[in-house]
Amino acid sequence: MKNIALIITFLLFCISISAQKPNYTKKTFLVSGNCEMCKKKIEKAAKSVDGIKSARWNVVNGNMKVKFDTNKTTSDAIQSAIAAVGYDTENYRAKDEVYENLHYCCKYERTIKKE
């Protein structure tokens, strides 16, 4: 009986630890792009990052609004994922070879200098 009580206590403790409440934050940053095709690819790249709750890119002004769990990811990780599919962000420049493979209508004016 004592062992059963001990096991139940241990299991409840484990459940409470694993049920950590998400710590969501919202961030806005710029992403270069031109069209609705860009929008789909940019949002898909952002949503592929573990911990993303929402991602919306505005075609007109280039603002990317994300909501994410700070226990699982960072704004830099999200921007890096977007740059990996060919789109420059505030902090990351897409690799030239990836940018060059974008559809012709998705090739935006690159403002971030090479490092």
Please describe what each predicted stretch is:
Residues M1-Y24:
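Bacterial Sec-dependent N-terminal signal peptides
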Residues F13, F29-S32, Y99-E100:
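Processing junctions and N-termini across compartments
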Residues K26-R56, V60-N63:
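N-terminal targeting signals for Sec/Tat export/insertion, comprising classic cleavable signal peptides
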Residues I42-A45, A77-G86:
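Short amphipathic alpha-helices in soluble, non-transmembrane regions
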Residues V59-K67, E97-H103:
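Surface-exposed aromatic
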Residues D69-T73:
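Helix N-cap motif at beta-to-alpha junctions
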Residues G86-V98:
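Conserved short beta-strand edge segments in small beta-sheet-based binding/regulatory domains
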Residues E100-E115:
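Short, low-order "capping/linker" segments at domain edges
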